[in-house]
Amino acid sequence: MTEAEQDKTIRAVLAAYDLPGHISGITRLVNGHINDTYQVQLEEEDRTETWILQRINDYVFKDPLLVMNNIRAINEYLDNQLDANDCGVIHFLANRDGIIYTEYAGGIWRLCPYVPNSVAYEQVENSQVLVSAGYAFGRFQALLEGLPMERLAETIPGFHDTPARLRKLFDAAE
């Protein structure tokens, strides 16, 4: 896809949302390995908002709608588990049709607020990053303990089999 086609597609997807202002910048974020991700700036008068727009990779996720349904189920569950003192959970913005994704040009797109000062690591520079990631993953697993698994669909075979994934991780670390 050319840059002009990419720009046209992104603008068409964003038109499905009730967003304030006009698009003042679109930057493709190249770190990350799965989805096509863009940082979008919107300006209205003297205010700028930053959003993250993603196209879900339908090669990795054969049915991207299952991914979005899982996210919706997890968000609904966590919204009832967390209080105001807990860390936030990313929510995808509903489009004008009230859906948390937009279908366009054969792709499934989703939009969420940009998290200021967020970092995506391509490589880990110190062990504290790994400790923090492990803590966050463990906390996430603990928070989901009461979520009925039948509410989630299998998006990748074995993806939700945490013991098997941990065995693979430990095997790879040896």
Locate the predicted segments by residue.
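Conserved ATP-binding subdomain of kinase catalytic cores across diverse folds
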Residues: 25-43, 47-174
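Juxta-kinase regulatory segment immediately upstream of eukaryotic protein kinase catalytic domains
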Residues: 1-27
